[in-house]
A protein has these predicted regions:
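Terminal hydrophobic membrane-targeting helix
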Residues: 1-93, 105-115, 119-127, 167, ...
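Repetitive beta-strand solenoid architecture
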Residues: 42-44, 56, 75, 134, ...
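Transmembrane beta-barrel architecture of outer membranes
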Residues: 153-157, 183
Length: 215
């Protein structure tokens, strides 16, 4: 079923999370699944806004509990958000507009170029919709960084999986100081106030300057 009935519901949920956020949608499709008492809402090609900054999305799928929806209770089971391939600068501008952080702003300013695509799954607690878990997977292509000492890291490509404060990166390739580096996998996990990093790093044959990792 094609409908616009849920436009306000979705935007109200977003604004309940943060008033800065809004969603621009075209057509919304509704699928009723009586076999498991659920409603699926499918939104194609929406845009999510924070002020004037926005991210292009490929689709949003929302799974609702039918009975709870009829009773006007907490009805959202899970949400899947799939983005289009966006410039990384578009994403960082969106994040800065949504919630500015000076330290993060300095880091973001080091990003010269590159593209990112991601899929986010959000699973809501049945009793309290303010409690949820999430998983973000995706890939970064052809990114380039300009570090504070004017040294460039280029040709950055990797896949990522973020879940429960654990960051997994795989198939990593990058070029630094005219040397190509690769990593099969790097895992970063939070341990108290610190982060623990595990993984591998290798390089193709090339001359490594003594100060490459101490600049």
């Amino acid at each position: 079923i094609k409908t616009n009935k849920f436009n306000h519901l979705i935007n109200d949920k977003l604004k309940g999370f943060d008033k800065k956020l809004s969603l621009k949608t075209n057509d919304i499709f509704l699928k009723l699944k009586l076999n498991n008492n659920s409603i699926n809402i499918n939104i194609d090609n929406p845009k999510i806004y924070s002020g004037s900054e926005f991210i292009d999305l490929s689709k949003i799928d929302i799974n609702l509990d039918l009975i709870k929806f009829i009773k006007n209770d907490n009805s959202i089971k899970n949400i899947q958000i799939i983005s289009k391939e966006n410039p990384i600068k578009t994403l960082t501008n969106f994040i800065n507009s949504y919630k500015f952080n000076a330290s993060r702003f300095v880091i973001f300013n080091q990003i010269e170029s590159g593209n990112i695509q991601a899929k986010t799954n959000i699973y809501f607690d049945e009793e309290n919709q303010n409690d949820f878990t999430y998983e973000v997977t995706g890939k970064v292509n052809n990114a380039k960084l300009n570090t504070l000492n004017e040294t460039f890291v280029s040709n950055i490509n990797f896949n990522f999986d973020i879940k429960n404060q654990i960051f997994n990166f795989d198939n990593i390739n990058l070029r630094y100081d005219n040397i190509d580096f690769q990593s099969k996998k790097i895992r970063i996990s939070k341990s108290g106030k610190n982060f623990e990093v595990k993984g591998d790093l290798s390089n193709k044959k090339g001359l490594i300057k003594p100060n490459t990792f101490s600049k």
